[in-house]
Amino acid sequence: ANKAPSTRMGNAALLREALLKAQQYTSKKEAGEDIKFDKTMESLVPVMKKELPILIHCHRADDIVTAIRICKEFGLKYTLEHVTEGYLIVDHILENDSLCAVGPTMFYGSKVENRERDFRTPIAFSKAGVRFCFTTDHAVIAGRHLRTTAGIAVSWGMDRDEALKAITLYSARHMGQDHRIGSLEVGKDADFVIWSGDPLCFLTHADVTVVEGNVVYEREVL
């Protein structure tokens, strides 16, 4: 019979147990001890060594708080994905400098956990100074609608420059790549798009796409 826990307390205990095993496995491996190969634990070694972040799927405020608490307990790098009820605990997220990917916002509440899905969290984050990025959770919402999401957030009252950063610089920061991409600065990769107008307007087209200084796309006018 499946004896997996059906409560949030039980799920948190499972996560903590897995991380504790990974912590012990990593310590023994680094000490050169003879250990039995475990592919699941091996996948967590880079997480325990802070080489990679652990991505936490969370919608509800209580789940977000639990995720932050457990990650801090083990001293992990982490990112929070979805963060639907983040607007309820803005100060807590800001205090912990948590990296958040908010969304998909252009989607109905498909379950109890995300029934509060709308643009309250991005607006609250923007006003409080939380540097978050948007996610469409492709293929829930197609990735091409990312800039549309940012544009709608502006219509709700989000600062336009912050909305643009939420799909560029802050997205790069979320992936740990802001030293290379996300903004036009000396020393970064020459990756950018030339738009026909405001990139946050759905009527705007991408005219030219440049990757590492090379033009890889030019729009043909029909």
How would you label these PLM feature ranges?
Residues A1-Y78:
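Polyanionic/metal-chelating signatures
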Residues K36-F37, I56-R60, E81-T84, K111-F119:
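A general structural motif
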Residues S43, L88-I89, T121, G182:
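Short acidic active-site motifs
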Residues P53, L94, G103-F107, K111-G197, ...:
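His/Asp/Glu-enriched, well-ordered alpha-helical/loop segment
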Residues E85-E95:
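Active-site-adjacent beta->alpha loops and helix N-cap segments on the catalytic face
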Residues T209:
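Short aromatic-centered micro-motifs
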